[in-house]
UniProtKB/Swiss-Prot annotation:
Name of the protein described by the UniProt record: Glutamyl-tRNA(Gln) amidotransferase subunit A
Subunit and interaction comment: Heterotrimer of A, B and C subunits.
Classification via PANTHER family: GLUTAMYL-TRNA(GLN) AMIDOTRANSFERASE SUBUNIT A, TRANSAMIDASE
Species of origin: Lactobacillus delbrueckii subsp. bulgaricus (strain ATCC BAA-365 / Lb-18)
Reported function: Allows the formation of correctly charged Gln-tRNA(Gln) through the transamidation of misacylated Glu-tRNA(Gln) in organisms which lack glutaminyl-tRNA synthetase. The reaction takes place in the presence of glutamine and ATP through an activated gamma-phospho-Glu-tRNA(Gln).
InterPro entries cross-referenced by the UniProt entry: Amidase, Amidase_CS, Amidase_dom, AS_sf, GatA
Residues of the signal peptide: none
One Pfam family hit: Amidase
One term under GO cellular component: glutamyl-tRNA(Gln) amidotransferase complex
Domain of life: Bacteria
GO biological process: translation
Active site location: 70, 145, 169
Gene: gatA
Assigned EC number: 6.3.5.7
Amino acid sequence: MNYLNETIDSLNDKLKSGAVSADQLAKDTIANIKKTDEKINAFITVDEDAKPAEDLDFNNKLAGVPIAIKDNIITNGLKTTAASHILYNFEPVYESTVVAKLKAAQATIIGKTNMDEFAMGSSTETSYFGDTKNPWNLNKVPGGSSGGSAAAVASGEVVAALGSDTGGSIRQPASFNGIFGIKPTYGRVSRWGLIAFASSLDQIGVMSKRVKDSAEVLNVIAGADDRDATVSEKEVPDYTSFLDKDVKGLRVAVPKEYMSDAVEEGVRKAVEAQIELLRANGAIINEVSLPHTKYVVPTYYIIASSEASANLERYDGIRYGYRAEAKNLDEVFLKSRSEGFGDEVKRRIMLGSFALSAGAYDKFFLQAAKVRTLICQDFDKIFEDNDVIVGPVSTETAFDLNSEISDQIKMYNNDILTISANMAGIPAASVPAGLSETTGMPVGFQIMAKRFDEGHVFQVADFIERSNKFYEQTPAGLED
Ligand SMILES: NC(=O)C[C@H](N)C(=O)O
């Protein structure tokens, strides 16, 4: 079964009418993943025994629908590695809240997708389990860190997948693969069972080819959870109620810093075309400024690495995961961590430990925390007179495999347009804007809104999807 021309609604119809059984759907999905993954390596683990829930109730839109999960989200009894050697054999004995909610809605969990190790990266090239390839061009990266989820959706292996986004990890791969991806408001979706990278920034979200599919999955996974005190008790609206609307009178802010010369021409043109589309349909376009944009990359990498250095202390070779051969206890810690973590993870642990150390704390961590407040204030100010902020997701389209991974500064700078939404905790999405005239690869259009205003994000994304119909295009890299 390939999902390129399916939606959750079309699958629900087929299952309801008996045109296909949920058992058969799971089997066909696994067979297709195995075939497609020979080319793209989107999955770390496929659950060969995946079975639909019993007594399916097709009033649940997700009943019997196979869904893929990023491999940093805990799945009870199904290997969860965060794409790291240090967790290469880790089989959790509990369930993450999002997966428990998907199972309660009777979705079939089909497997775990590839990613950058512990979500640290923007190309899925830091995975211990090999690179994922971009279905639009197999010589290009799928982006990251949720590159496996994005490639799985873009190639039609699944209709929807969960990802996580700390500094752009859902939106950037969604943009590189020509699909939709949404990072909800910080506190909208429980992080219980998400393997922590930077706890004040991490958020679980959804990736799918079509906007409505993500709205339907978010309906299921959002909402309060006793196990995560950072999740809001706010009622979860029906996100599909924001679809099929026009954009007349909508106040749309375009930050001038997001349309600078640093943005590749093909990306800028595709993004400008969507802005013109909104204008032509009655939206009010306002040029605005996010003056602290030039500080977001260093601020993010100090905060995220500091939190990571503390969160990753738990991997000690004793309790779970990889344990190196050693002569004494000190050596167990030292060798397990040295051999278990990859270079990028070690780099961030060292950077973060330094930023938190006695002599450096005030100058780095504290300073970064203060700048973060200024970044948040930039957004609050714009949202006083605007409903959404739009612009590109990334300064470029998917780049060649092995072309940027050894240049950390370049890799980090690539995140400049996505990181701020995490620092401000606001919802943000990427919706396809077409193919770049210069590279022929997909371009993503970013939409951000106030905290807990996913509604406006869905409204604009759905409007753009209906207008440019990018979903009619199929990824060229998979043709034989
Ligand atoms: N995790 C993310 O959201 C991706 C970001 N590029 C990082 O490496 O931190």
